[in-house]
Amino acid sequence: MSEITHRTKTRPVKVGPLTIGGNNEVVIQSMTTTKTHDVEATVAEINRLAEAGCQIVRVACPDERAANAIADIKKQISIPLVVDIHFDYKLALKAIEGGADKIRINPGNIGRREKVEAVVKAAKEKGIPIRIGVNAGSLEKRILEKYGYPTADGMVESALHHIKILEDLDFHDIIVSMKASDVNLAIEAYEKASKAFDYPLHLGITESGTLFAGTVKSAAGLGAILSKGIGNTLRISLSADPVEEVKVARELLKSFGLASNAATLISCPTCGRIEIDLISIANEVEEYISKVKAPIKVAVLGCAVNGPGEAREADIGIAGARGEGLLFRKGQIVRKVPEETMVEELKKEIDKLAEEHYAKLEAEKAKAEQETQKA
């Protein structure tokens, strides 16, 4: 089973039923590609994202039609809704009134102080946080004039400026992002931000590219940041179906042991010893475990001689040979199974492990409730 890597502790901030920061796990976020005023299409996409493992979803709110749709969207989805606002404070007020769980603004772009005060007052009344979104591509003119071009120091200065506006209004339910398309700049900005303030950080490499190139670029940048214990939520930004963003995010978090609700596949790269169709089997198993909400490590290996030993860390796995497969747990062979049924046998064992995990969680939940009642 996976173990959660140590996180840099930050101030906890509530987003709907979730708590971002503190000692909580990194939360996966994505953004819809639909026109927000098209409620039916937007809800359908959000529900697809939630099924894939998305935990928070953001929608664009460029106009009043989009703002008016927030309430209808909110009623039909099961995950927290973030509304993206640029410049028009009235749209922020409508989004908050419509049930947004978080809004993303830059207070300095909203206009006069009374406009910012109105947004902060509404957010306070509803108990929702504000995300300050700093982007290297849209830094304030004064910052660019001071530094000459986008720098990590300039990005942090911008963040601190917007944070101060909110803090001066006694508002502290803040989440901050420091996005850049340049990987090295993003890494430096997030490192410096993590030392400059204790608000939770939303991670992202912006404009990262298409499915393949963007996955590599995001994994390189966000992987480096996560490895330093920095980050509380993240989005993989891709020019692709947003469901792919969620899939990549889950895999990235699993790589660092940061996902306690996802199964992981281990499979060998294939060689001349293989006597089964390992690639298609691995793909089938990967698809099967994509919906398993338990931290199980599953191995699919092509060599019965070295397979079990090579996957000692796996909770369950198969190693194929001519006409049969070896089913094993923690590197120990459990039994031999015919080749034609070995994938189905593996799936049954995966289901058993998942059920054991779910039962354990329910028992822990029941125990916690009993202790709460006693207190």
Swiss-Prot record:
Superkingdom field: Bacteria
InterPro entries (alphabetical): Dihydropteroate_synth-like_sf, IspG_bac, IspG_bac-typ, NO2/SO3_Rdtase_4Fe4S_sf
Cofactor: record remark: Binds 1 [4Fe-4S] cluster.
GO MF, any single term: 4 iron, 4 sulfur cluster binding
Catalysed transformations (reactions): (2E)-4-hydroxy-3-methylbut-2-enyl diphosphate + oxidized [flavodoxin] + H2O + 2 H(+) = 2-C-methyl-D-erythritol 2,4-cyclic diphosphate + reduced [flavodoxin]
HAMAP family named in the record: IspG
Name recorded for this polypeptide: 4-hydroxy-3-methylbut-2-en-1-yl diphosphate synthase (flavodoxin)
Source organism of the structure: Bacillus velezensis (strain DSM 23117 / BGSC 10A6 / LMG 26770 / FZB42)
Organismal lineage: Bacteria, Bacillati, Bacillota, Bacilli, Bacillales
